[in-house]
Structures are given as structure tokens and as C-alpha cells.
């Protein structure tokens, strides 16, 4: 917070900007075995080789929409930290109610 006291909103002395690593191609971190395990949990026995890239694309678009909504809730509340409730409300807005995380 660099010397702004509790709840340091407003302009004032900003801290030094840290260098952020540019994130790219992280979707490949969802590995083939991880997708296979999820499919097994869903009752799938055999998996085509073409499925993996398709699953990554669908998962990426789903997460982008949920995260976009969650960040919108966070910004509206004038916070910088996305809470679990923001994600719960974002999922509820998309018709996928999630129980067990409050709200």
C-alpha cells in the first residue's frame, strides 16, 4: 500500500511497478492425462486423439467468460481482489449455481 494507511484508495505515491511475466500458451498446461482423468470421471471409456485440443478450447472460452464476470463484480465493488463469492455470483449469472462457497 506504500504509506497510504488502511484502505489506501486514491492517488498518491504508487509503489514501484514489478515486471510481470508475459503469460502465453498456458492452456497447454491442461495436460492430456488431466483431460483423460476428467473424462474418466464422467464415465468415458475411449477418447479420440482430436478431443484434447477441442477440450482445451472449450475450457478456455468457459473460463474466460466466468473470469470476465467475476472481475466485473470485483470492479463494481471497488476491490482489487477477486473473492470466491465473485466467482459464485458469476457462475450463478450464467445459470450454473455452485453451492458450498457462501452466497
From Swiss-Prot:
Pfam families given in the database record: CENP-T_C (PF15511)
Entry-annotated residues carrying N6-methyllysine: 6, 9, 13
A GO term for molecular function: DNA binding
Residues that bear N6-acetyl-N6-methyllysine: 6, 13
N6-glutaryllysine: residues carrying this PTM: 92
Function: Core component of nucleosome. Nucleosomes wrap and compact DNA into chromatin, limiting DNA accessibility to the cellular machineries which require DNA as a template. Histones thereby play a central role in transcription regulation, DNA repair, DNA replication and chromosomal stability. DNA accessibility is regulated via a complex set of post-translational modifications of histones, also called histone code, and nucleosome remodeling.
Protein name, UniProt field: Histone H4
